[in-house]
Amino acid sequence: MDKWINMAESPAHKWGQIIGNFIEKTFEKEFSKFARKHKLYLDKKGTRSARPGKKVCWIDSFGNSHDLDFVLERGGTDKKIGKPVAFIESAWRRYTKHSRNKAQEIQGAIMPLVTTHKNFAPFIGVVLAGEFTEGAINQLKSLGFNVLYFPYDLVIKGFSKFGIDAGSIENTSDNDFHNKIKSWNDFEDKTKLERYLLRIN
């Protein structure tokens, strides 16, 4: 337990969260544009009158709840849950040793919902960034996932274009991570970085 708490509070963990949240927010904007264009409703993390709390949570046919990143709905509004036409997850992983577990986690969250809502034949997609093994990616593709992958080196290249050293190794010091976090907090061109990453992938 103490180890988990220390890990959650570590600057390395915080830096990983920053990158993961940035990738997620980048695609939230893209999915919002898509939803407007196709007259769909995008459910994402945050408050919504139609559901409790701030999480996007759907129930499968066995009564199990699954937290998701994005759901595109037909006929949905802030006050009404629509029919699911797409379930989409996003994930950042720095090291491949965690990638297969994450792939299985995504699979476990979405596949029961696909079965539950098979009459709507929902699209299933995932945005992966960082270090993911070919096996983890192929595992998701074999299940019908559409995978958009941003390799670790490409993400680092994108950040470095704007003067931010986003890279890290196992023995990167806490002080180095604090410097990365400060650089990010001071960085004002996040929208330009979003566009650049989308362009170079």
Each PLM stretch: what is its role?
Residues 1-48, 200-201:
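Interdomain/boundary linker segments immediately adjacent to catalytic/signaling cores
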Residues 142-201:
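Non-catalytic C-terminal interaction segments of nucleic acid-processing enzymes
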Residues 81, 85-86, 90-149:
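Catalytic cores of nucleic-acid endonucleases
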Residues 47-51, 94, 154:
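Residue-level detector of flexible, active-site-proximal loop/helix-junction positions
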Residues 43-81:
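Active-site metal-binding core of divalent-cation-utilizing nuclease and nuclease-like domains
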Residues 13, 17, 21, 60, ...:
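Short, charged/polar micro-motifs that form catalytic or ligand-binding hotspots
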Residues 19-27, 63-67, 95-105:
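Phosphate/oxyanion-binding active-site loops and adjacent basic polyanion-contact surfaces
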